[in-house]
Amino acid sequence: MEIVISAIIGLLIGGTVVFVIKRLQDNNKKKSARFEAERIVNKANSEAAKIKKESENKAKDFESRARKNVEQDIHKQKSTLKNKESQLERRLKEVEDQFKQKMEENERYLNSLKDREEKIAISENRIKDLEKKGEAHIGELKQKLESVAAMSQDEARRQLLTALEDEAKQEAAKKIAQIEEEANKESEKKAKRILATALSRFASEYTSERTVSVLALPNDEMKGKIIGREGRNIRTLEAHCGVDLIVDDTPEAVVISGFDPVRRELARRTIEKLMEDGRVHPARIEEVAEKQRNELMKSMKEEGERHVMELGIPNMHPELVKIIGGLKYRSYQGQNALNQSLEVATIAGLLAAELGVSVKLARRAGLLHNIGKAIDHTVEGSYAFVGAEAAKKYNESEDVCHAIRAHDEEEKPHSILAWIVHAAYTLSSSRPGARRPQMDTFIHRLEDLESIGNSFDGVLKTLALQAGKDIRVLVESSRVTDDQAVMLSRDIARKIEREMPQAGQVKVTVVRETRSVEHAR
């Protein structure tokens, strides 16, 4: 029994202990759960604070960027408004200037009207005075008639009419002289105004002429190629291009000398093409020179077409266009012929606009006035008449042809178009820096030397080199023998002495070359 009681008591104690332990465990779990919950809550609060802080930072960053964008937009709008304001101010100033100009013109017009009114008033007063004088004179005549009653009625009438006629003639002569004087003053004033208006709307460059061109070479090796063995290449270039090539100690450069700009341009293009190709020998030089000559002719035509289009001149013959392009390489008294033609055409157009004449026709005549200078100098006659004949040949009107002939007073101008072109030519030629007469004299001297050489039979080409101190005459080997070449050089020298005694010492070199070509098949 005691065992049972002990067992029961033990069970009770054990159950109590188990209960107490279980209770303690439950309390611990609750406590740990509470701690865990608090930890989770604290963590959530921390993350929430972190997210809040990040959101605030992002919001601040977004606000900063937005403010910056707004400020930039405001700055751009301010700049745009400022530009528009400047434009409006400029436009307002232009309008004010125009208004001021119009007001000045109106004032001048009103002043002229006042002057006319004053003149009219003076004329009316003069007429009244004349009427009074006439009435008084008539009264005197009546008294005379009364005093000479012995006169017949017809005689008295004749005397009265004669006296009135003489007085009227005197008054008319005075009035005519006054009108002529006023007309001359007014026409001179208007002419000066027209010329001043035309010149103020056009300005051109100062003219300077040169007879040499410096061509840069890539290296001195190319200089040696241009010279060639024993100078064969350089002699071939000079013969086919008609210039004098000067190769000195200047590094990587060769000087092209010649009075004809067309020949200098041909030589420059030929040498540049040979440098690109790298093959330099006489046969290649001859081939390239011929090709570049054709391309140069093509470029001259394109140059003429461009200027004709710029001036708005319609329906011009292609040959005339080509001749106009050729003026680019011609000069007269140091003035480039094409630039001078464009200058005359522009001034003629401005004068025509002021005078109410066809602007296009005036520009056409002004542009064509110089074409005689681009035609081969072997054609006889002055350049004005040669140019007029060429214009007539290519279907230009008689008014244009007459303006070409009369622009330099070789023919008396008898049309308004001819006078306009003559005035434009005079203005272009007489402005400061337009011409250099000594250059033109020098070029004519070289052309005369070449013409003398070309006048002999068997001569292919004559080239004036070294400023006219050396001329080279290329002859046909089939027509001129070696002995004849010696005599030919002597004959040319004698003719130069006779016809150009002022030329000084001139070296005449006759070049006779025999070339044999055969093709292997």
Curated annotation (Swiss-Prot):
Enzyme type, top EC level: hydrolase
Domain KH: 211-271
GO biological processes: mRNA catabolic process
Pfam family, one: RNase_Y_N
Keyword vocabulary terms for this entry: Cell membrane, Endonuclease, Hydrolase, Membrane, Nuclease, RNA-binding, Transmembrane, Transmembrane helix
InterPro entries: HD_domain, HDIG_dom, KH_dom, KH_dom_type_1, KH_dom_type_1_sf, Ribonuclease_Y, RNase_Y_N
Enzyme Commission code(s) on record: 3.1.-.-
GO CC term (a single one): plasma membrane
Stretches that traverse the bilayer: 1-21
Subcellular localization: Cell membrane
Membrane topology field: Single-pass membrane protein
Disordered: region residues: 51-87
Main location: membrane
Molecular functions per Gene Ontology: RNA binding; RNA endonuclease activity
Signal peptide boundaries: none
Keyword Nuclease: yes
Domain HD: 337-430
Function according to Swiss-Prot or TrEMBL: Endoribonuclease that initiates mRNA decay.
Similarity-based family: Belongs to the RNase Y family.
HAMAP family (alphabetical): RNase_Y
PANTHER family recorded: RIBONUCLEASE Y
Protein's name according to its UniProt entry: Ribonuclease Y 1
Organism in which the protein naturally occurs: Bdellovibrio bacteriovorus (strain ATCC 15356 / DSM 50701 / NCIMB 9529 / HD100)
